[in-house]
A protein has these predicted regions:
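C-terminal end segment of the histidine kinase catalytic
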Residues: 167-188
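Two-component histidine phosphotransfer core
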Residues: 1-165, 172-175
Length: 188
């Protein structure tokens, strides 16, 4: 009986993983102009996190506390996924009671997304070098962070992109600064 229950649970997990993978692939192939909404991006993140929790045995908790009124803002597709991936692989993986919290606030004509994890912190100089594109840092790790930062700066200018919150002592936090722009399909 136990063996049958194990298999049934395995099938359920396989079904969940395939559904999450389908959600991710749908996001990839349905995106024609490279832009999406914060709401769609957070749905993609949830699917990605579901897969990673299956992979690592739910060793961390994920919380999305972005206010729904910000869900209609435009964001380049796959902006948050590499940051959350970094938080999982370099922050909370192997940490007891690891947490990743994604939040956002409006700030003047911009909005800022925060990705915080309570796991391992990082060296300020290494992160700054990585975000600037220092070759020796990109070769080791963080190519996703570098790519996201570069893409945001190219799209919106030097005042936008990733900002490392150096004041966090227990954990790691990256801010994503973006201009407020509601997607054309959501404008009323």
């Amino acid at each position: 009986i136990k063996e049958g229950q194990d298999r049934a649970g395995g099938n359920e997990n396989t079904e969940k993983a395939l559904e999450a993978l389908g959600d991710i692939l749908h996001a990839v192939y349905s995106n024609k102009n490279g832009m999406t909404t914060v709401g769609q991006e957070t749905a993609l993140l949830k699917a990605y996190v579901d897969i990673m929790q299956m992979r690592f045995g739910s060793s961390f908790q994920y919380y999305n506390v972005i206010p729904t009124e910000l869900f209609y803002y435009e964001i380049p597709a796959f902006t948050m996924q590499p940051i959350v991936e970094n938080a999982i692989l370099h922050g909370v993986k192997g940490v007891t009671a690891g947490q990743i919290i994604v939040s956002a606030i409006e700030y003047e004509n911009d909005f800022v997304i925060s990705v915080f994890n309570n796991g391992n912190s990082a060296d300020k100089k290494k992160i700054e070098d990585l975000l600037k594109g220092e070759k020796n840092q990109r070769a080791v790790t963080g190519i996703g962070l570098y790519n996201v930062n570069s893409r945001l700066k190219l799209l919106y200018g030097e005042s936008y992109g990733l900002i490392y919150n150096e004041k966090v002592r227990n954990g790691f936090e990256i801010w994503v600064r973006l201009p407020k722009k509601i997607t054309e399909s959501e404008e009323r």
